[in-house]
From Swiss-Prot:
Lipid metabolism among keywords: yes
Protein name per UniProt: UDP-3-O-acylglucosamine N-acyltransferase
Task performed by this protein: Catalyzes the N-acylation of UDP-3-O-acylglucosamine using 3-hydroxyacyl-ACP as the acyl donor. Is involved in the biosynthesis of lipid A, a phosphorylated glycolipid that anchors the lipopolysaccharide to the outer membrane of the cell.
Species in which this protein is naturally found: Caulobacter sp. (strain K31)
Quaternary organization: Homotrimer.
GO cellular component, as recorded: membrane
Gene3D superfamilies: Hexapeptide repeat proteins, MurE/MurF, N-terminal domain
Length: 340
């Protein structure tokens, strides 16, 4: 269930209504009156929830869906358990997105007053000119908020934080002693898109961002909120300027990421990992605790704990050095020769 501090519940809908909105069809017309109240990921959908299956590799996950509703392709209907109502479509993700928009809406600042009267500011909070704070937001003692900062509805900011000019924070829970530098964007929608019958559609991002105590986010860096769950930056981790952390990433404690690092969605990073500048990490990987990723490395496979990887594609440092030396020898020891 999306966090009600950040998302408004628009009320239940019948399966018949969702089928009409999404372009799907009911596998069993008798289920058209069944009510759905919220969306959920496939692995945790229960009674009252609607989810989707688009990846055939996850067919085994259908077994736990008794009482839930699922968008899926017609050829996968036979794999669903009894008691799971089905909405059949060739575009499960896009159809689910239409249902999600019907059931949930992001809470937005109404704009009537820059600082909403329903926000809570503890003693010693300093607000510079031009700050916008949404309904239900809470800011802890001693926090300093720079000019032009936007803090969205429901956001919780801890004590003794420093928020730089023009930073934007939404859909987020921020710990104590966190520094967010100028222009950083925390909690915007992660990149989710799927093909639909009339073209590509955006997938709703219904999760949050959690910044634990002592985190630093550099200028103009972005940390996207999760698709369903949380994007988490662990305690005392330090992120440089111009870094992008995608949705559902879990970054451990005491990690460092130099400028232009990009960490793709749902990657899990252990404690004490260091990323050199311009390092790129593909999605759904695991970077083990204490690993080091070299500058400009492109990581397409999970990295074991404590290892140092670099290169394109990234591989263990000793292997990269050996292969680079071999290439140099083959090129005559002086690289590739140009024209004399």
């Amino acid at each position: 269930m999306p966090d009600p501090r950040f998302f408004e519940d628009l009320g239940p809908a019948t399966l018949a209504e969702l089928a009409s909105l999404s372009g799907a069809r009911l596998a069993d017309p008798a289920t058209g009156h069944q009510l759905v109240s919220h969306v959920a990921p496939l692995e945790s959908a229960g009674p009252g929830a609607v989810t989707f299956l688009s990846d055939p590799k996850r067919l085994a996950d259908l077994a736990g869906l008794s009482g839930a509703v699922c968008f899926l392709r017609p050829e996968h209907a036979a794999d669903a358990p009894p008691g799971c109502a089905l909405l059949l479509t060739n575009h499960p993700q896009a159809s689910w997105a239409a249902a999600a928009h019907r059931l949930h809406a992001s809470r937005r600042h109404d704009g009537a007053q820059p600082v909403h009267p329903d926000c809570e500011l503890e003693e010693g909070v300093l607000l510079a000119p031009g700050v916008v704070i949404g309904q239900g937001a809470r800011i802890g003692r001693g926090t300093q908020v720079g000019p032009g900062v936007v803090i969205g509805p429901g956001v919780a900011v801890g004590r003794d934080c420093r928020i730089g000019a023009n930073a934007v924070i939404g859909f987020a829970l921020v710990g104590d002693r966190v520094s967010i530098h100028a222009g950083a964007v925390i909690g915007e929608a992660g990149f989710g898109a799927a093909g639909g019958p009339t073209g590509v559609v955006d997938l709703p991002q219904l999760g949050r961002v959690v910044l634990q105590d002592g985190v630093t986010i550099g200028a103009n860096s972005c940390v996207d909120r999760g698709a369903f769950g949380d994007t988490t930056i662990g305690e005392n981790s330090k992120i440089d300027n111009l870094v992008h952390v995608a949705h559902n990433v879990r970054l451990g404690r005491n990690c460092v990421a130099a400028a232009f690092t990009g960490i793709s969605g749902s990657t899990v990073v252990g404690d004490g990992v260091a990323f050199g500048g311009k390092a790129g990490v593909a999605d759904h990987l695991t970077i083990g605790a204490g690993a080091n990723i070299g500058a400009a490395a492109s990581v397409f496979k999970s990295v074991p704990a404590g290892e140092t990887w670099t290169g394109f594609p990234a591989r263990p440092l000793k292997r990269w050095l050996r292969e680079t030396a071999w290439l140099s020898r083959k090129a005559g020891g002086r690289g590739i020769k140009g024209p004399e």
